[in-house]
């Protein structure tokens, strides 16, 4: 798939959805009840992907609603310092807060996240706050699945998708399923399918595609066959330690292994994967190489304490691949 058309546009990528605060446990190998210190980072899948792609050298913008308080200002400054354009970032005027995620690291295999997302600002982004003039400056618009979980954010995202299609902006859909935000699985399947059928690139885990299909034990062949009846050009399905697969509408199949690393935590891998995979496509690399970039970036992030701060550079990604091969 060619992401290099419209090179005259201001942004390579605009991401849409939540930006929140991650509070990651500094003390490892102990439960939350015994953890006393945390480090603060910017979090939220679309914010992390904006950060990851910006660190890789892409021109990036962000659309989302944040709190008008200290946490909101922290998020905005952090992203601006990475040269991420925040003209699409809206401040909530009704006292809503950004989400908080406390992470627990009992062991590399036993990590959990304690979420505080009641009445959060990001889910109150409205359709009126979506600018066509902003979206049409992008080559790709990335949608995060969690932004579809509630109204009015849901309608804002659907408007953004419609404007992207109208203005020949390619759509990438990162499924980003978070069960704590959704009312029921039927609702998830409906809205995921609405966006997936309009997306050019769809990225998710096998379990996330099962949520979209409202089933258990789905098969990649059936998933790609359905999506290729619609807009999709590339479908990426991740299988954890078994690696990941990319399928194209032209009938090609590619596979990348998961790179071995010393795992510190299990979260953050998906956002770094999406960032590096898209970077590979923007760089004109083959899909096979883009898959390797995604897998390598995920391996790097799970070996480090944060998600956003740990997003790797292109040199770090290429060095890991070269070392492994």
Curated annotation (Swiss-Prot):
EC primary class: transferase
Biological pathway: Polyol metabolism; myo-inositol degradation into acetyl-CoA; acetyl-CoA from myo-inositol: step 5/7
Matches recorded under InterPro entries: Carboh/pur_kinase_PfkB_CS, DKG_kinase_firmi, Myo_inos_IolC, Myo_inos_IolC-like_sf, PfkB_Carbo_kinase, PfkB_dom, Ribokinase-like
Catalyzed reaction equations: 5-dehydro-2-deoxy-D-gluconate + ATP = 6-phospho-5-dehydro-2-deoxy-D-gluconate + ADP + H(+)
Any Pfam family hit: PfkB
CDD domains (alphabetical): KdgK
Protein origin, superkingdom: Bacteria
One annotated GO molecular function: ATP binding
Region forming the signal peptide: none
SUPFAM superfamilies xref list: Ribokinase-like
Enzyme Commission number(s) from the entry: 2.7.1.92
Keyword annotations of the record: ATP-binding, Kinase, Nucleotide-binding, Transferase
BP term (GO), one: inositol catabolic process
UniProt keyword ATP-binding present: yes
PANTHER family cross-referenced by the UniProt entry: 5-DEHYDRO-2-DEOXYGLUCONOKINASE (PTHR43085:SF49), HEXOKINASE FAMILY MEMBER (PTHR43085)
Role noted for this protein: Catalyzes the phosphorylation of 5-dehydro-2-deoxy-D-gluconate (2-deoxy-5-keto-D-gluconate or DKG) to 6-phospho-5-dehydro-2-deoxy-D-gluconate (DKGP).
Protein name in the entry: 5-dehydro-2-deoxygluconokinase
Source species of the chain: Listeria monocytogenes serotype 4a (strain HCC23)
